[in-house]
């Protein structure tokens, strides 16, 4: 019997797959527990429509990430942060990714989750620093952060 998996079933199939399984297994376990449904022509065409909609939605998200990347990588987009520093240019403390995210939101009205800012170590010196920001699985932008003395 052909079924469409509604969720992942270990060893049998993943969500959205159409597979042939034994009749008893399909009726007594998969369909009864809501893990799959019979693969009728209407159900298969509905699945294709869902996959198209998901692909379109994913393409829109990718396009939005690309637009945001061009805005962030613009030469005029420099995140200004003021901090107390010593005479040698080293900061008292450091600038973590949370502070960069709040400064970006205040200055440019762009809200980015602090976990998407990929700062290996907090910024501890004054001057310009290039910081990578992962906007999407396939899109990574680089923003310039300028740390000035307070």
UniProtKB/Swiss-Prot annotation:
Signal peptide stretch: none
Gene Ontology molecular functions: rRNA binding; structural constituent of ribosome
Family annotation (InterPro entries): Ribosomal_bL9 (IPR000244), Ribosomal_bL9/RNase_H1_N (IPR009027), Ribosomal_bL9_bac/chp (IPR020594), Ribosomal_bL9_C (IPR020069), Ribosomal_bL9_C_sf (IPR036791), Ribosomal_bL9_N (IPR020070), Ribosomal_bL9_N_sf (IPR036935)
Domain of life: Bacteria
Keyword Cell wall biogenesis/degradation: no
GO BP, one annotated term: translation
GO CC list: ribonucleoprotein complex; ribosome
UniProtKB keywords: Ribonucleoprotein, Ribosomal protein, RNA-binding, rRNA-binding
Pfam families the UniProt entry points to: Ribosomal_L9_C (PF03948), Ribosomal_L9_N (PF01281)
Key word rRNA-binding present: yes
Family label: Belongs to the bacterial ribosomal protein bL9 family.
Function comment: Binds to the 23S rRNA.
Protein name per its UniProtKB record: Large ribosomal subunit protein bL9
Gene that encodes the chain: rplI
